[in-house]
Amino acid sequence: MRPDDNHSLTAGSRRLTLATALALVMVVTAAACGGSSSGGSTDGSIDDSSEVLAEVECTGSAPEAGLGEGQVCADNGFRPTSDDFSFPNWAGVQDQDGGDGFTLDTLVRLYGASEVCVDGIADPCAPTPIATQTIEQWSGALAGGRCEGMATLSLRYYLGLDQSGVAATVELSRPNVSLEQEINYWWSTQFVDEVKAQAAESRTNDPVTLTKQLAAGLTAGLGYTIGIYDEGFGHAVTPFAVTKVDSGYVIHIYDNNAPGEARTISIDEAANTWTYDKTAENPDGTPAAWSGSTGTLELTPMNARSAPFACSFCDQGDSEGSATTKGYVTVNLAAGGSTGDPAAGLLIATADGRRVGVAGGVVVNEIAGAVYTVGKGGLGTSLVSVELPVN
């Protein structure tokens, strides 16, 4: 969708009703974002980044480690061809029995029966109206792929946080309902408040700082996923090493869109920017590069994904037209489609002209307390979420 096609909602400066907000849940045209062995056992994050940054040293030989040129700053030992999934990221529901779809059980696992089921009754669980709506929206978002889930779960297997049941992750295959549901679960954690908060905080740091934090964390045995964004699209990958080269740094990654292939994100130290030249494909089949600076690269620590999570939207819509009792309304937009346009043409404006959403191909946020999030799927349709304060 082009910027001049943006949908706009004008609301009062004090209150936005839930019924009005939910009317914005729609499908619009958007672009595709791309086409367990030894390792640390902790899933913590670095508390004092200034302290650990000083400890990062790049002295090992990258060629000897099979990591190209330069010096090794960090290497946790994860390698595509053994620790990645043998199958690529996939879109939508492909199993004949629908076993790879998003389920009520997964939502209960995230938030608990007390939040998801009517009267908190788990067996049998009758989903609340907002739970039913969430399942429908997240099921639609699966049409854009499961990059966040595959990036997270492959690393959890490697770090020993979860057990794959095989000698090496690469031995797993699909269809495999239990594996697919596990991937869906970790994919959906990107939408919970705790994970969104950690990711958003990391995006306030510049690429060089994040790279040094990553190197320190990998050296300490910590687990992270990387999120990258370009023109409103999002993709998630698994970092496993950092090397130092003349121009800056290289982050070595497993991209679940390309199993069995080690890829890299380049960090230009002087410009303080990042570039990933194999994120997607142009219509002619040639690679399409993504790039960015502060605000478009994120690190999400594994410890942010510890359930159960707080469900900030679960009591929305108790009565028709009412606003949420937890302080804000969530507007979700499933977006997917053609190549080359912003990921979502959603723009919300207050009566006094403050905006949040995509304007002119750029994400803007002029509403205090509002949060704009682009889901990471890796293949197309994604879930765009806007949280709006009601007071």
Language model features with spans:
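C-terminal motif of bacterial Sec signal peptides marking the signal peptidase cleavage site
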Residues: 29-32
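Bacterial signal peptide processing site
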Residues: 34-37
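Extracellular glycoprotein-like low-complexity segments
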Residues: 309-391
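Conserved active-site-adjacent core of cysteine acyl-enzyme catalytic domains
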Residues: 153-234, 256
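Active-site signature of cysteine proteases
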Residues: 230-303
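Bacterial N-terminal signal peptides that target proteins for export
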Residues: 3-21
